[in-house]
UniProtKB/Swiss-Prot annotation:
InterPro entries, sorted: Tektin-like, Tektins
Protein name: Tektin-2
Record note on quaternary structure: Microtubule inner protein component of sperm flagellar doublet microtubules. May interact with CCDC172.
Protein family according to the UniProt entry: Belongs to the tektin family.
Reported function: Microtubule inner protein (MIP) part of the dynein-decorated doublet microtubules (DMTs) in cilia and flagellar axoneme. Plays a key role in the assembly or attachment of the inner dynein arm to microtubules in sperm flagella and tracheal cilia. Forms filamentous polymers in the walls of ciliary and flagellar microtubules.
Main location: cytoplasm
Amino acid sequence: MATLSVKPSPRFRLPDWQTNSYLLSTNAERQRDASHQIRQEARVLRNETNNQTIWDEHDNRTRLAERIDTVSRWKEMLDKCLTDLDAEIDALAQMKESAEQNLQAKNLPLDVAIECLTLRESRRDIDVVKDPVEEELHKEVEVIEATKKALQQKISQAFEKLFLLQEARQRLNSDHRGKMETLDIDRGCLSLNLTSPNISLKINPTRVPNGSTSLQQWDDLSRFNKDHGEAEMKKAIELREAIALTIAETNNELEAQRVATEFAFRKRLREMEKLYSELKWQEKNTLEEIAELHEDIRHLEEDLRRKLQNLKLCHTRLEARTYRPNVELCRDQAQYGLTDEVHQLEATIAALKQKLAQAQDALDALYKHLARLQADIACKANSMLLDTKCMDTRRKLTVPAEKFVPEVDTFTRTTNRTLSPLKTCQLELA
C-alpha cells in the first residue's frame, strides 16, 4: 500500500495569507499613488523649469542686447572722442610747427641786428656815440630775445600737451579696443541658440575672473577716459589759441621795432648828411681862405723884400754921405730926410714882419683846422657808409631771400645804381 511522502515545511495560516494579499494590494495602490504624485510633480516641475529656462534665456538675451546697446553707445562716444582727439593732435602739432618756424625765422632779424651793431663798431673818433640808432638796435635785440623766449615757452608747452594728448588717446584707444572686443564677444553670445554646434559644458563657468569690476566701476572708468580726453582737448584748444596769439603779438612787436629802428636809421642818416654838407661847405670856404691867405702872404713877402731894398738904398745913401769931406759933413735936410726914411722903413719892415708872422700863424691854424675838418668829414663819410650798409643789410627783413641783391658789398662798392656825388665822396674817404 502506497504511502504519502510530504516534505516537512512551515505552514502559514489563512489569516496570514489574507493579510499578505491585502498588504500587496495596499502597497501597490500606495506605490501607484506615489508614482502618480511624482508624475504630477514632475510635469509641474517640467512646465515650471521650461518656463523659467525660456524666461531666463529670453531675459538674458534681452540683457545681452541692452548691454550691447550700452557698450555700442559708449563705443560711438569713444569713436567721436578719438576722432576729435586725433584732429586736435594734428591741429596742435601744426600750430607747434608754425611756432617753431616763427622761432627759426627770428634768427634772421637777430643776426641782422647784431651785424648792424657790429658794423657800427667800426665808427671812428667822435662818431662813436650812443645815438638813438644804437639804442633802437639794442632794444631790437632785446625784443627778439623776448619773442624767442615766449615762442620757445609755448613750443615746450605744446610738446608737453601733445604728450598728454597722446597719453589720453592711448587710454581712449585701449578702452575703445576693449569695447570692440566686448561687442564681438557679446554679439557672438547673442547669436548662440540651442541648436548652435559650438555650445558645450564648461568647467566652472560661473567663476569670477581676476580683475573683474563692477558695473559702476566700468561706467566710471569709461566716463573718466572720455571726460579726461575732452578736458585735455579743451586745454589743447586754449593752448593753440594762446600760441596763435603769441605768434601774432611777437610778429607785431618785432615789426613795430623794425619800423622804429629803420626810422632812427633814416633820421640819423639825414642828420649826418646835413652835417656832412655843412662840413664840406666849411672845408671849401677854409680852402678858399687858405688860398687867399697864401696870396696875401706872398704880397707881404714881396712888400717886405721891396722895403728891404728901400732900406738898403737909404743905408747906402747914408753910408755914402758919411764920406763927405770936412765941413761938408753936415746934417742937412737930406741927412734928416734919409734918417727919417730909415726909421720909417724899419718900422714898416717890423710891422710887415709882424703881420707876416700873424699871417703864417693864421695859415697854420687854418691848415690844422682843415685837417680836423677833413678828418671829421672822413668820419662822417665812414659813419654814413656804415649806416647805409646797415640799411642795405636790413633789406633782408623785407625782401625774400631769393630776390635779395646787396646794394653795398663787402668791399664798400655799390652795384645796380648810380651814386650821387655825396655817396661817391663817402666811398672815396672811406
